A protein has these predicted regions:
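Nucleotide-activated chemistry modules centered on ATP-dependent adenylation/adenylyltransferase
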Residues: 1-177
Length: 177
């Protein structure tokens, strides 16, 4: 999605500045942009974030009350998952319960399910899903999110094998360059 992080940051910057002005206190925006997206989305790079913040400051009075927190700017999804695992442990919450409720898929799939009527699943073939699956493989634990394809729900092993095959093919192709 071209320019998506600029769109998101514009919205959140305006909300944050409104809150900062109303409360007369600073507001920090947390953004989950990460290094894994740098090659695909230029608006995930530090240079873009700096330019975006400069434009925000130039266009708004009291903009210094708003700052950005981008803890994952230089790390990939694996490092984000490690941090999430650590945070869940510190907070005493179940990692799987948290992460089964997240969906990074650009192509979620909706299927009828007898107990819940309609249920949304993550696809496991899109680039964002493969990147997520790769991070869970590196972490050494199954991804608790529900996956599906055009035929219906699939288990973690199916999603994992598909991602591993794609990653292997990509590595082989990259070696030919």
């Amino acid at each position: 999605v071209p320019n998506r992080n600029k769109i998101f940051s514009s919205i959140i910057q305006s909300v944050a500045l409104s809150i900062a002005n109303e409360t007369k206190s600073p507001v920090q925006i947390a953004m989950g942009i990460h290094a894994g997206d740098h090659a695909i989305y230029p608006d995930c790079r530090q240079e873009f974030r700096d330019a975006d913040y400069k434009a925000f400051c130039e266009g708004n009075w009291d903009s210094e009350r708003v700052s950005a927190y981008t803890p994952y700017l230089d790390v990939d999804k694996f490092d984000i998952l490690k941090d999430g695992e650590s945070c869940c442990e510190c907070l005493g919450i179940d990692f799987d319960e948290v992460y089964k409720r997240t969906n990074t898929s650009y192509k979620p799939i909706k299927f009828f399910h007898t107990s819940t009527r309609w249920k949304w699943y993550s696809d496991y073939k899109s680039a964002s899903s493969v990147e997520r699956i790769e991070a869970f493989i590196k972490l050494g634990r199954p991804d608790p999110v529900a996956y599906a394809d055009e035929t219906g729900p699939v288990n973690w092993e199916t999603a994992k094998i598909h991602a591993e095959e794609l990653l292997y093919d990509w590595a082989v192709d990259k070696g030919r360059d």
